[in-house]
Amino acid sequence: MMAKSISNHIDFAVGFQRQDITFVYVKDVVQAIFLTLDHGMNGRKYFLSDGNVYRSSDFSNLIRKALGNPWWIRITAPVWVLRIVTSIGELVARSTGRISALNHDKFNILRQRNWRCDIEPTMDELGYHPHYDLARGVAETIDWYKNEGWL
């Protein structure tokens, strides 16, 4: 959704306070699953990320770069605007019977200012070491989207 928006020259962000977030690429998730099957403790939960903390703008900047740096307008709206948009999304979804990407669950995720994951226990217990940082994961994802005709 964000890549499509940026390819259409709009980067939409929510909230005026800094947002720190972590990311994990799907291939690193698969690695962690296999490591958990081999070395994980029953009932134990493991956090995953690429080991770095990013600002939300880092993500959109990397998407823009992978798309060839199209011109864009960055719009930052207050959190209450997101609440209205997700409420409308929920109403439309209920009335049409379709799932909305902009719903109350998404609101609760996007309004948070800190999504930092400590992967040290995962690294120590499982031997997990991420192979993809955000830049590499975004570049590979955008290439895949283009090849599949999604962008």
Question: What residue ranges belong to the model's regions?
Answer:
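Residues that recognize and position ribonucleotide moieties
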Residues: 22, 52, 75, 108, ...
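Residue-level signal for the nucleotide or nucleotide-sugar donor/cofactor binding architecture
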Residues: 21-27, 54, 117, 132
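NAD(P)-dependent short-chain dehydrogenase/reductase
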Residues: 1-31, 35, 63-64
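A short C-terminal helix-loop "cap" of Rossmann-like NAD(P)-dependent dehydrogenase/epimerase domains
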Residues: 3-14, 69, 98-101, 120
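Amphipathic terminal alpha-helices
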Residues: 120-125, 129, 133-151
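Mid/C-terminal beta-alpha module of Rossmann-like enzyme folds, strongest
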Residues: 36-102, 135, 139-140
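Conserved C-terminal active-site "lid" loop/helix of NAD(P)H-dependent oxidoreductases
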Residues: 26, 61, 86-128
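A conserved catalytic-core signature of glycosyltransferases
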Residues: 18-19, 49, 105, 112
